Curated annotation (Swiss-Prot):
The chain crosses the membrane at residues 35-55, 59-79, 107-127, 154-174, 183-203, 257-277. One of its GO terms (cellular component) is mitotic spindle pole body. It comes from Schizosaccharomyces pombe (strain 972 / ATCC 24843) (Fission yeast). Component of the nuclear pore complex (NPC). NPC constitutes the exclusive means of nucleocytoplasmic transport. NPCs allow the passive diffusion of ions and small molecules and the active, nuclear transport receptor-mediated bidirectional transport of macromolecules such as proteins, RNAs, ribonucleoparticles (RNPs), and ribosomal subunits across the nuclear envelope. Due to its 8-fold rotational symmetry, all subunits are present with 8 copies or multiples thereof. The lineage of its organism: Eukaryota, Fungi, Dikarya, Ascomycota, Taphrinomycotina. Component of the nuclear pore complex (NPC) and the spindle pole body (SPB), which plays a key role in de novo assembly and insertion of both structures in the nuclear envelope. Involved in the formation of the bipolar mitotic spindle. Anchors the spindle pole body in the nuclear envelope. This is Nuclear envelope protein ndc1. GO terms for biological process: mitotic spindle pole body duplication; mitotic spindle pole body insertion into the nuclear envelope; mitotic spindle pole body localization; mRNA transport; nuclear pore organization; protein transport; spindle pole body localization. Disulfide bonds: none annotated. Residues 56-58, 128-153, 204-256 are perinuclear space. Coiled coil: none annotated. It is found in: Nucleus, Nuclear pore complex; Nucleus membrane; Cytoplasm, Cytoskeleton, Microtubule organizing center, Spindle pole body.
Length: 601
């Protein structure tokens, strides 16, 4: 008797479009819009840098032309930002190691040359626009029968522009302006500017004041050298009266105010340009009111592909934010995610495995650091999830992925009585018996008297604890930031999966989520407990309790996301706990956290 098949495989599903393939042209369009906004900013800056009748049409036209020239020299700044853009900050264990990393020659010279090109153009336009009003000409007007001379006021403003270039470079590298505090921004440009306008003005004002106060003192120390170099350089281009001694002191209150105004406008211009770059390039997944993956022939497959793109962090962040939008606002996509099971691995299983891997990666890093204290092993990429051991053998499989027992490099089948003597083997290799002279294994403590040795160690430790060497000491805050460099991505992933679980009661018709709720709660509880135990073990030895929130800022945000997920799922599914096949430990832990939350609220 032949049995007929009652189920047939579905038709061949077309391969989903890569998420980055859809995102790349969108990023190019956003970069062009950011360049247009930068052009408008350069025109406004050139208008404020010029001096003349503000109502004149010729003055406006000249400002527009200068704005195009400023944009030509400001464009390398955008190119530098795009080449160095990142979604997470690289954090070292100590400030000294952080400075060595941030101010490496490759990074420093690239950023310095970029600012030198852009800032020099803006400062020269300001000096040229106010040359007649405050006597900032390069060459001073000579008297009758005298050669022209170099104008020291011009030399001072040029030196001030170089100080401004150095200040902007140091600020950009030290504060890591290439990676924003929030990796992805989903607000309009004008709203974002208005939200940060007060901070922009205050920050630019403080930086301008610091430059204006520092420059006169440094110029007074280096005045003779700067004057000789400027006079020698000018004499190569123009015929001037060359003198090695500078004239009278050029600085006045009016020149100081002009230098402050120039620095303030330049700093404000670069801060707004940075916000322009962020608000366009780090924008969210909404394109004309439509999500990015909706343009694909397989929206769910494209979304999962974007969330699994590890080599392109910006693509991963935007795809994760799109999942958050779907979980909060799009019931139709939620239904399609729950019903998309016609695959080798369903979409829900893909989303769950992504969240599980990120939770286990964090928990594994914390366990390694807590047990061994090896920070490099905890933060390395190999300290994440271990490979699965239940890999079936096949002739074409990679043998390196199969866990094997390493064997010693000798014949293990020879009986012990037939083995060779280690002493005879050494005689064969060395040709003589090994020396029986005892080796001094005590080290330097046996050569130097113990009292002197203790004094030296005490002096070195006291000298190392001095405030001067504070930048080389490892701090708890930097360690925690390096363990979770992108807390935003972790929190959004956990919150998105939690929202999908909460809405599964309404939209999950096949029951694909109910089977994994116990596993989700187990992952959440285990990761949360590891975070809590790690924090408690460090708080005991923490000397300053006032900085605990700052030191554990990233880990606290991750713990809050996990805690809220446990509380929300427990509250929503408390009537079905007996049907979820929860382990007694996880069920007890969920109820404890839920009751603590209710009692505190």
């Amino acid at each position: 008797m032949v049995m007929l098949r009652t189920s047939f495989p579905s038709g061949s599903r077309t391969k989903a479009v890569r998420y980055h393939t859809l995102l790349r042209p969108i990023l190019q369009q956003r970069f062009l819009r950011a360049c247009f906004a930068l052009l408008c900013l350069c025109c406004i800056t050139s208008y404020w840098f010029s001096s003349g009748p503000f109502i004149s049409l010729s003055f406006w036209f000249l400002s527009l032309v200068r704005g195009f020239v400023c944009f030509f020299f400001m464009f390398p700044y955008f190119v530098m930002l795009k080449s160095r853009m990142s979604t997470q900050k690289v954090t070292k264990q100590s400030l000294g190691a952080q400075l060595f990393y941030d101010f490496s020659p490759k990074s420093f010279f690239l950023v310095y040359l970029t600012f030198a090109v852009s800032v020099s153009c803006l400062c020269l336009f300001y000096i040229k626009g106010h040359a007649s009003s405050i006597r900032l000409q390069w060459i001073a007007s000579p008297n009758a029968y005298e050669l022209p001379s170099l104008n020291e006021r011009f030399v001072y403003m040029t030196y001030f522009s170089h100080i401004l270039i150095l200040a902007l470079t140091v600020e950009h590298l030290y504060l890591q302006r290439d990676s924003p505090s929030r990796p992805v921004i989903n607000v309009s440009f004008f709203n974002y500017i208005f939200q940060n306008l007060g901070w922009l003005i205050r920050f630019s004002f403080r930086k301008s004041i610091i430059c204006c106060l520092f420059t006169p003192f440094s110029y007074a120390i280096l005045r003779s050298y700067i004057w000789r170099f400027a006079a020698l350089l000018t004499s190569c281009c123009r015929r001037i009266a060359y003198t090695k001694t500078p004239p009278k002191w050029p600085l006045s209150l009016r020149l100081l105010l002009h230098s402050f105004w120039m620095a303030f406008i330049v700093c404000l211009t670069f801060q707004i340009a940075l916000l322009i770059f962020r608000v366009f390039l780090y924008s969210g997944p909404m394109i004309r009111g439509k999500l990015l993956s909706a343009r694909s022939n397989d929206p769910n497959g494209t979304l999962v592909d974007g969330m699994k793109t590890k080599k392109k962090p910006l693509t991963e962040c935007i795809a994760t934010e799109e999942l958050w939008f779907i979980a909060k606002r799009d019931p139709q996509r939620i239904k399609s995610i729950f019903q998309d099971i016609d695959r080798s691995v369903s979409i829900w299983q893909e989303l769950y495995s992504i969240t599980e891997s990120r939770c286990k990666e964090l928990a594994t890093s914390l366990k390694i650091l807590q047990s061994t204290g090896d920070f490099s092993a905890a933060t390395s990429k190999k300290s994440g999830l271990t490979k699965k051991t239940n890999i079936p053998y096949s002739p074409n499989s990679n043998h390196e992925e199969i866990n094997s027992i390493p064997l010693r490099n000798k014949n293990i089948f020879v009986p012990p009585s037939q083995g060779h003597s280690p002493l005879l083997e050494k005689i064969k290799k060395q040709g003589s018996l090994p020396s029986t002279t005892p080796v001094n294994e005590g080290g330097i403590s046996d050569i130097i008297p113990k009292s002197l040795y203790d004094q030296v160690i005490r002096f070195i430790s006291t000298f190392y604890k001095a405030p001067v060497f504070g930048i080389f000491r490892k701090t708890l805050r930097r360690q925690n930031e390096a363990l979770l460099p992108n807390p935003w991505l972790f929190c959004v992933t956990v919150n998105s999966l939690t929202q999908l679980v909460l809405k599964s009661l309404k939209y999950d018709t096949y029951g694909v989520v109910a089977r994994d709720i116990s596993s989700i709660l187990a992952v959440y509880c285990d990761t949360f407990d590891v975070l809590v135990s790690y924090k408690r073990s460090l708080v005991k030895n923490h000397s300053n309790s006032t900085n605990l929130d700052d030191d554990f800022k990233n880990l606290n945000s991750a713990a809050n996301a996990l805690h809220c997920g446990i509380i929300d799922i427990t509250e929503k599914f408390q009537d079905f706990f007996t049907q979820l096949n929860l382990s007694p430990r996880i069920e007890r832990r969920c109820w404890v956290l839920f009751r603590e939350y209710k009692s505190n609220s």
